Design a protein with these regions (language model features):
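Short, Lys/Arg-enriched N-terminal segments with co-localized hydrophobic residues
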Residues: 37-49
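Cysteine-cluster motifs in flexible loop/terminal segments that predominantly coordinate metals
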Residues: 25, 30-33, 91-122, 250-255
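Helix-loop-strand module that forms the ligand-binding subsite of alpha/beta enzymes
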Residues: 105-196
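N-terminal beta1-alpha1 ligand-phosphate binding loop
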Residues: 51-79
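Glycine-rich phosphate/pyrophosphate-binding loop and the adjoining helix
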Residues: 111, 190-257
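A short beta-strand-loop structural module common to alpha/beta enzyme folds
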Residues: 82-91
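Acidic/polar hotspots within intrinsically disordered regions
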Residues: 2-4, 15-18, 40
Length: 257
């Protein structure tokens, strides 16, 4: 090792950028890291891969929304980030009844459905992407019912990067994305951009793939998500702690006389 701790295998042609990348690596104790071409610690790196949960709010398993999420998933894989598509599908999802029981256990009292399953998956996920087709200029009703309960009960969302995408034949995607983004804002999740609004057009998966700009936006979103996850991980390894969440202050705008 060098005096500054950089592996000797980096001498002779290794750029300053390689050394910089190595300095943030969480596997520095393997001495010969992936930056310098060695595969020591590869199994450990594989086990510690970052993961993004992608929720498909469409009732159609292989429709346009799934196709858009698959484009993102392929890009994430190219960036060494795992992903999983969870389809809410045609399940009957109850809406939130506002009982408040989830505040204690951070699980929905209506067990046995997709809501608690998603909450369990979020515990082991580093990022979240939610996709929906447009239903009357809003997300699908099933998705909204699920999200109301998920974000009311969940406590594993704070500072995890998130993004919303929408698919449509023609219009209504802007308010659809806006509805989903508001869930992220309420629990302190930073939102990840593409290179334009996270929307893609098509009535069928085949038509969707013809929207070259939309496809590019999905790819860019995948790369940006991977980059943000890596930046957060690099910050942790550099000793930069995430800001602690303050205890929530809840007020009403109605003042008693």
């Amino acid at each position: 090792m060098y005096a500054d701790g950089v592996p000797k295998s980096m001498e002779g042609g290794r750029s300053e950028n390689d050394v910089s990348l190595w300095s943030f690596c969480r596997f520095r104790d393997c001495v010969e890291c992936c930056v310098c071409g060695n595969r020591n610690g590869a199994e450990e790196r594989k086990e510690n891969k970052m993961k993004v949960l992608m929720i498909n709010g469409s009732p159609n398993e292989n429709g346009c929304t799934n196709t858009a999420l698959e484009i993102i998933g392929k890009t994430l894989a190219e960036e060494q980030v795992d992903s999983e598509i969870f389809q809410i599908g045609r399940n009957c999802v109850k809406g939130c009844i506002g009982c408040g029981a989830c505040s204690k256990e951070h699980r929905c009292i209506f067990d046995g459905g997709v809501v608690n399953e998603i909450l369990d998956k979020m515990e082991n996920s580093d990022g979240l992407i939610i996709g929906s087709p447009v239903y009357f200029a809003s997300p699908s009703g099933t998705l909204v019912s699920a999200l109301d309960r998920i974000f009311m009960a969940g406590d594993k969302f704070y500072l995890k990067p998130a993004a919303a995408i929408a698919t449509a034949r023609r219009a209504g995607m802007t308010p659809t994305v806006d509805v989903v983004n508001r869930y992220f804002a309420c629990v302190g999740m930073p939102t990840v951009p593409g290179n334009y609004y996270n929307m893609i057009f098509g009535r069928t998966p085949q038509e969707l793939l013809q929207d070259e700009e939309g496809v590019q936006t999905m790819r860019t979103l995948g790369r940006n998500m991977a980059w943000m996850l890596k930046c957060i991980e690099a910050g942790k390894n550099a000793g930069i702690d995430a800001p602690a969440a303050e205890k929530k202050i809840k007020m009403t705008f109605i003042r008693q006389a």
